[in-house]
Amino acid sequence: MASEIFTIAGLSIVLTLVGVALGYGILRITQGGAE
């Protein structure tokens, strides 16, 4: 059971980092293109 908890926690952290990176990248592209 412990392994499942760590796996879920790891996946959630990775997905969160990926989401933040994508959002930041999109903002940079849109702002850079606008300027």
Swiss-Prot record:
Protein keywords: Electron transport, Membrane, Photosynthesis, Thylakoid, Transmembrane, Transmembrane helix, Transport
Biological processes per GO annotation: photosynthesis
Residue spans crossing the bilayer: 9-27
Keyword Electron transport in record: yes
Subcellular locations according to the entry: Cellular thylakoid membrane
Principal localisation: membrane
Pfam families hit by this protein: PetM
Any GO molecular function: electron transfer activity
Membrane topology: Single-pass membrane protein
Superkingdom of origin: Bacteria
A GO-annotated cellular component: cytochrome b6f complex
Similarity-based family: Belongs to the PetM family.
Function summary: Component of the cytochrome b6-f complex, which mediates electron transfer between photosystem II (PSII) and photosystem I (PSI), cyclic electron flow around PSI, and state transitions.
Subunit annotation: The 4 large subunits of the cytochrome b6-f complex are cytochrome b6, subunit IV (17 kDa polypeptide, PetD), cytochrome f and the Rieske protein, while the 4 small subunits are PetG, PetL, PetM and PetN. The complex functions as a dimer.
Protein name (Swiss-Prot/TrEMBL): Cytochrome b6-f complex subunit 7
Organism: Synechococcus sp. (strain JA-3-3Ab) (Cyanobacteria bacterium Yellowstone A-Prime)
Top-level taxonomy: Bacteria, Bacillati, Cyanobacteriota, Cyanophyceae, Synechococcales
